[in-house]
Curated annotation (Swiss-Prot):
The active site is at 138 (phosphocysteine intermediate). This is Dual specificity phosphatase 29. Disulfide bonds: none annotated. It is found in: Cytoplasm; Nucleus. GO terms for molecular function: MAP kinase phosphatase activity; protein serine/threonine phosphatase activity; protein tyrosine phosphatase activity; protein tyrosine/serine/threonine phosphatase activity. The keyword ATP-binding does not apply. Substrate binds at residues 137-144. It comes from the Eukaryota. PANTHER family: AGAP008228-PA, DUAL SPECIFICITY PHOSPHATASE 29. GO terms for biological process: negative regulation of MAPK cascade; protein dephosphorylation.
C-alpha cells in the first residue's frame, strides 16, 4: 500500500453521532454505560418509574395477591417463557389483567429491538386507559424490562436515550446489558433522523406557502 494512501477506519460502535442540523449528539455506547456508574436508588423488587408505570422483578410478577391488591391492570413480561419468568395469561386468569409476553433472553447478542415498537405500543395503550397500572417485569427488573421501558419513553414521550435513562435511574437501579444499550442507541439515532426529516419537511412547506 502506498505511503500516502489514506487508511479507512472501521466504524466505531463507541463513537458519538452528531446531527449537524439540530446539534443533538447521540452518545457512544461507552458514554451510555457511564450513566449507570453514578448513584441510583437501592435495588428493590419494584419501583414506579413513570406515572402508573412500574418496573419489577420475578418475585413481583409471581405475587398475584399483591398485584391485585395494588390494582395492577396490565403486565408486560419481558422474560416470557417456560425457562424464564413462566407466567402468562393463564397464570393471571383469576385476575382482571391484560397480559403481554416478550420471549427475550438477557444476552448482548439478543435482538431486543424487534420488540421495541410492539412493547411500546402495549405500554402506551395501557397507560392511556383510565385507572390503569402497568408492571413491566423480567427476572431482575434491570435489563430486559428496563430496556423496553426506555424504548417506550423514547418512542412515545419524545425523550432521547440519555433523558430516558436519567428518568428511570431516578427511581430504579437498572443496568441494561451492552447489546441492549447499543440497540437503544440505534433507536435514538433513528428517532433523531425522523425528527430532523419531519422538521425539514415542515420548514420546506412553510417556505412554499
Amino acid at each position: 500500500m502506498p505511503a500516502d494512501t489514506p487508511i479507512r477506519k472501521k466504524p466505531n460502535a463507541y463513537a458519538s453521532v452528531v446531527d449537524p442540523d439540530t446539534g443533538y449528539c447521540t452518545p457512544g455506547a461507552f458514554e451510555l454505560e457511564r450513566l449507570f456508574w453514578h448513584g441510583a436508588p437501592k435495588y428493590t423488587h419494584v419501583n414506579e418509574v413513570w406515572p402508573n408505570l412500574y418496573i419489577g422483578d420475578e418475585k413481583t410478577a409471581l405475587d398475584r395477591y399483591s398485584l391485585e391488591k395494588n390494582g395492577f391492570t396490565h403486565i408486560l413480561n419481558a422474560a416470557h417463557g417456560r425457562w424464564n419468568v413462566d407466567t402468562g395469561p393463564e397464570y393471571y386468569s383469576d385476575m382482571t389483567v391484560e397480559y403481554y409476553g416478550v420471549e427475550a433472553e438477557d444476552l448482548p447478542s439478543f435482538n431486543l429491538s424487534q420488540f421495541f415498537y410492539p412493547a411500546a405500543q402495549f405500554i402506551h395503550k395501557a397507560l392511556s386507559t383510565p385507572n390503569s397500572k402497568l408492571l413491566v417485569n423480567c427476572a431482575m427488573g434491570r435489563s430486559r424490562s428496563a430496556s423496553l421501558v426506555l424504548a417506550y419513553l423514547m418512542i412515545y414521550k419524545n425523550m432521547t436515550v440519555v433523558e430516558s435513562i436519567t428518568q428511570v435511574l431516578k427511581h430504579r437501579c437498572i443496568l441494561p446489558n451492552r447489546g441492549f444499550l447499543k440497540q437503544l442507541r440505534e433507536l435514538d439515532i433513528k428517532l433523531a433522523l425522523e425528527k430532523r426529516d419531519t422538521h425539514g419537511t415542515a420548514n420546506k412547506a412553510q417556505k412554499d406557502d
